């Protein structure tokens, strides 16, 4: 099944602790916890585009597998990032900076399970295709 499409956040576990460990400020954390963002995935040849859309903030990363790029992390810091693919449907994103963050997006049919880790804190968020 192709991964392109739109997915809505259905379930979020431990996301507030993940944001705490990352050092996200109170106002941003409060807003982020209450939102139900839409994940939009687009594939343009060998370039992938992942967008997170919400009423509070929209973000986008555009990348080619294995190629380093820069992005603004959730705490506002500019970091170097690399995304690799494992199998057909699992994308492993590593953000390098003062803290290393790993974000795994596992596309499972109509669901995307996003596991984000920083330090010894892990958050799991599940999105459903819309």
Curated annotation (Swiss-Prot):
(5Z,8Z,11Z,14Z)-eicosatetraenoate binds at residues 105, 125-127. It comes from the Eukaryota. PROSITE patterns: FABP. The keyword Manganese does not apply. It holds the Pfam family Lipocalin. (9Z)-octadecenoate binds at residues 105, 125-127. Keywords: Allergen, Cytoplasm, Lipid-binding, Transport. InterPro entries: Calycin, Fatty_acid-bd, ILBP, Lipocln_cytosolic_FA-bd_dom. GO terms for cellular component: cytoplasm. One of its GO terms (molecular function) is lipid binding. It is found in: Cytoplasm. The keyword Nucleus does not apply. FABPs are thought to play a role in the intracellular transport of long-chain fatty acids and their acyl-CoA esters. Binds the natural fluorescent fatty acid cis-parinaric acid and oleic acid by competition, but not retinol, retinoic acid, cholesterol, dansylated or anthroxylated fatty acids such as dansyl-DL-aminocaprylic acid and 12-(9-anthroyloxy)-stereate. Belongs to the calycin superfamily. Fatty-acid binding protein (FABP) family. Forms a beta-barrel structure that accommodates hydrophobic ligands in its interior. This is Fatty acid-binding protein. It comes from Blomia tropicalis (Mite).
């Amino acid at each position: 099944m192709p991964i392109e499409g739109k997915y809505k956040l259905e379930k979020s576990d431990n996301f507030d602790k993940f944001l705490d460990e990352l050092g996200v400020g109170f106002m941003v954390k409060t807003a982020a916890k209450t939102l139900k963002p839409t994940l939009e995935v687009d594939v343009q040849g060998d370039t992938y585009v992942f967008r997170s859309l919400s009423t509070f903030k929209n973000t986008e990363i555009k990348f080619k597998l294995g190629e380093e790029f820069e992005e603004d992390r959730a705490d506002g810091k500019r970091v170097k990032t690399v995304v690799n693919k494992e199998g057909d449907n699992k994308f492993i994103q590593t953000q390098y900076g003062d803290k290393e963050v790993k974000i795994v997006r596992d596309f499972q049919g109509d669901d995307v399970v996003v596991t984000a880790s920083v330090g010894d804190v892990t958050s799991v968020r599940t999105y459903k295709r819309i």
